[in-house]
Amino acid sequence: VSYNPGTSVKMNPVFASFWIQKITNIPSIFTLSTNDLNIQAIEGLLLGAQSLGLNNVVFVMGDLPSRAISTTKVLEFTKKMNQGLDINNDKVSYATSFCIGSTIDISKDWDHEIVLTKRKIDSGSDFFIAQAQFDIARVVRFLESYRNVTGTHIDIPILWGVQMLAKGSGSFTNIPDNIKFDLENGKPGFDIALDIIDQYFSYGITSFYLLPSFFKTGRRDYLSAGKLISTLT
């Protein structure tokens, strides 16, 4: 569950995740932005989330990184909370048991992103979420570059984004011209998403998440996303 995506105010992701998990009985992941909250607020939200039965959290830097607590610092003190301690090494009400996630953005400078990715792993990230990609060969090149620079594989799960498309829908990443052409000439966005997933499979990558197609009105096509999940499972 994203943290206030777009410009409008949304339900706090902790409460939205609790509602989704309660209704579906499927473990939910909530997101917290480190530029809107101080350390005490984050710790309080994490304790509250844990009391509601939420165990999965992703930390993002947000749109104002100059105001944000570094993601690595948040990862470190959340790991301490899993040991029953707060940032000052004082005991918290109860030890948490979070599976802690952070993000990878391969659209940025790779030299910096590779170093940051390694730091996030060392700081306690249990998994990564990556932005939607249309060029899967680029994903593979990034993973190879990481291995060449650090001497190790990324040995924690990465959930790669698959952006579903439709005529008139938006995208959080640039859409290649060939995919725009296919879409404008009648190829269903459903089939385009399947093609992208097949490319992931061809490289042995089997972990991803779907972003339903979205429109300027705010509408999101969750039905098509559900159909795609049913097709894959």
Language model features with spans:
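Catalytic-face loop-and-helix region of soluble metabolic enzyme cores
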Residues: 153-209
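Active-site mouth loops of central-metabolism enzymes
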Residues: 27-40, 98-112, 177-192
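Acidic (Asp/Glu)-rich catalytic clusters
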Residues: 14-25, 46-54, 87-95, 118-122, ...
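Active-site-adjacent beta->alpha loops and helix N-cap segments on the catalytic face
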Residues: 7-20, 37-45, 63-90, 110-112, ...
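Hydrophobic faces of well-ordered beta-strands that scaffold small-molecule active sites
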Residues: 1, 28-32, 57-59, 98-104, ...
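C-terminal extensions of enzymes
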Residues: 194-232
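Short, acidic/polar
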Residues: 13, 39-47, 109-119, 189-199
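Catalytic beta/alpha-barrel core
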Residues: 1-9, 32-34, 57-61, 126-136, ...
